[in-house]
Amino acid sequence: MNLKQLAGEYAATFVKDGMKIGLGTGSTVYWTIEKLGERVKEGLSFQAVPTSKETEVLAQQLNIPLISLNDIQSLDLTIDGADEIDSNLHLIKGGGGALLREKIVASSSKELLIIADESKLVTHLGTFPLPVEIIPFSWKQTESKIQSLGCQTTLRLKNNETFITDNNNMIIDCVFPHNITNPANLHNHLKMITGVVETGLFVNMTSKAIIGTKNGIQEL
């Protein structure tokens, strides 16, 4: 069993009967969703909000009952992955392009459970490029303003074409030369730029992290 599968399947044990949960996106959460599909067959009853079309399709294939955030007040738990996790449980997310919906769902949850393998643990955020979701209109001007914060930027592509999010936006991936020492401050500065929709910095949102290591599960 690989480390992503180890963490992902373990996280499924946190889902209890009657819960309303958020389901994240990515290669680690895939294993959680697969395991939850097995538990549904065994009689577990819960409802889920998907954070992407990709997750929605997988959940439907496994007969996991889906609901809309518009129909409920809050979620009991969201299970999601991360691209980087620092010692304060601040995150970089959005490598898969679903950061806006992931943040909306996470902020609607009483708890955010992050799952990852040990390679995602870092001292400081920023080795992994920070995704920033922007609107397409006048995107070059928005990118220029982002660059003024001291980073190198790349417009995200997929199959040699501009990557478009589930919300019909674009993503700028940002590399800061000296890592990100104050994620909250950077997030606030980015959000003040007109044209920026959301950032991949998840600050003070994580309740617990489940890390798959060579020695087993580590809870942070």
From Swiss-Prot:
Top enzyme category: isomerase
Residues given in the record as substrate binding sites: T25, G26, S27, T28, D80, G81, A82, D83, K93, G94, G95, G96, K120
Reactions performed catalytically: aldehydo-D-ribose 5-phosphate = D-ribulose 5-phosphate
One of the record's GO cellular component terms: cytosol
A molecular-function term among this protein's GO annotations: ribose-5-phosphate isomerase activity
Pathway(s) it belongs to: Carbohydrate degradation; pentose phosphate pathway; D-ribose 5-phosphate from D-ribulose 5-phosphate (non-oxidative stage): step 1/1
Keyword Transport: no
Gene3D superfamilies named in the record: 3.30.70.260, 3.40.50.1360
CDD domains: RPI_A
Keywords in alphabetical order: Isomerase
EC identifiers of the protein: 5.3.1.6
Bilayer-spanning residue ranges: none
GO terms, biological process: D-ribose metabolic process; pentose-phosphate shunt, non-oxidative branch
SUPFAM superfamilies, A to Z: D-ribose-5-phosphate isomerase (RpiA), lid domain, NagB/RpiA/CoA transferase-like
Active-site residues from the entry: E102
Subunit relationships: Homodimer.
Homology family: Belongs to the ribose 5-phosphate isomerase family.
Stated role: Catalyzes the reversible conversion of ribose-5-phosphate to ribulose 5-phosphate.
Stated name of the protein: Ribose-5-phosphate isomerase A
